[in-house]
């Protein structure tokens, strides 16, 4: 299948829509995640088109206003606790509704991978893990530990998920930031892979 089979748009048309939703820096990141996701899909025997599309759309809603996110929460996921978290959580979990509104994506695997890319899940599909890890390791990323994450991603996707999640939890804790409950669940489910 191609991107057009999932969206009704070919890659060029889709890139135009995605580009319109974000800054140049974010768009370059998205292209890097798409590339990393396709590479991971090839390595782990997953559908490259599906992985590439999920990656291309993973930050589609990242630069929406808080008011737009609150509208989407009220319309699709009326959860008062969700409202307290903000964009870092919303753009995945709630952003899928904007993607459905704008692009009519119906594939539940793609939507789930986009929803989970910010917080993970105790149960992640191969596609979920690909997008989650690709977002962390794409070639534009430059931070302590990213090279180790890239190497882990080449040998074991579960170890890469565990490493990324452990680093994220440690970073948030070091900044005295709240940690989304699903992220803690992801950590607890995957940390045994690092033993």
Swiss-Prot record:
ADP binds at residues 29, 59-62, 91, 117-118, 135, 141, 178-183. It catalyses: P(1),P(4)-bis(5'-adenosyl) tetraphosphate + H2O = 2 ADP + 2 H(+). Its EC number is 3.6.1.41. GO terms for molecular function: hydrolase activity; metal ion binding; nucleotide binding. Keywords: Hydrolase, Iron, Metal-binding, Nucleotide-binding. SUPFAM superfamilies: HD-domain/PDEase-like. Fe cation binds at residues 29, 58-59, 135. CDD domains: HDc (cd00077). Residues 26-140 form the HD domain. It comes from the Bacteria. Hydrolyzes diadenosine 5',5'''-P1,P4-tetraphosphate (Ap4A) to yield ADP. Belongs to the Ap4A hydrolase YqeK family. Homodimer. This is Bis(5'-nucleosyl)-tetraphosphatase, symmetrical. It comes from Streptococcus agalactiae serotype V (strain ATCC BAA-611 / 2603 V/R).
